[in-house]
Every structure is written in C-alpha cells, then in structure tokens.
Amino acid sequence: MKILVTGAAGFIGSYVVQRLLERGDEVVGLDNINDYYEVELKYGRLAECGIVKEEGGGDKLVHSRKWSAYRFIRMNLEDSQAMEMLFVNERFGRVCHLAAQAGVRYSITNPRAYIESNIDGFFNVLECCRWNRVEHLVFASSSSV
C-alpha cells in the first residue's frame, strides 16, 4: 500500500514515516520545510530516514538512502497543481495528513500563512483524495495548530 505522509519532517510525521516503513508500507513523505521550527531539526529527522539535505530541495521526489520504499518531496500543500500531479502520478491508497502551520501567537500577526497552509492546503489534500479515490485519509493535529 502506498501512503502519503504530509508533515513528514515534523516531530510526529517523522515517527509515522518510520513506523510505516518498518511495517512494510511504501511511503512518500511531503513537507515544505518552513522555518517556523528549526530547519536543521527537520533535516535531521529526514536524515534519520535516509533523505540527504542536499538532495531534498526543489520539487522532485528524492529516494531514501536507507529505505528503498521511501521517497520525499519538498512541496507546499497550497500548490494545487503540484499536489494534483503528485496524486495522479503516485496513486496513493492512503493519506496521513499531519502538515500544518503551527503556533497560536504567530497566527495573530500572520493570519494569511494559516489560511494558505491550514485551510487552502487541507482543501487541496481533500480534493486530491476525492478525485484520486484515496481509500483512507487520516487527519491529525496538535494543540500547537
């Protein structure tokens, strides 16, 4: 089963990716690597799954050096065309949506960032799941979102 994990470089997302790979799933991780949280921590989590920082830029799928069943793409959820292409090309059976712009205080001064990521981005995930007949969608959030 091929599974998309959004927020794959985040704390929870990186653990979800590892557990799915350990149980034998094929996984595509997606994250925009924004700088709200420490970027080097995110790249460190990706490195634990075999994704090399220098290869993880741009909008191309990068193959893991540790797991043959893992690929990663740096992408914004709000890029509807890129999301549509990813879903069409990869034909995911399941999606675990963990990506979001976090932080309550930051949302007061930068509401547009939250609308684009947490509303528009999630809408794109939902539409891509619907149009590509994804069997299951798991949506999770934290108190920080």
Question: What is each of the regions a protein language model found here?
Answer:
Residues M1-V145:
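N-terminal Rossmann-like NAD(P)+-binding domain of SDR-like oxidoreductases, especially those catalyzing
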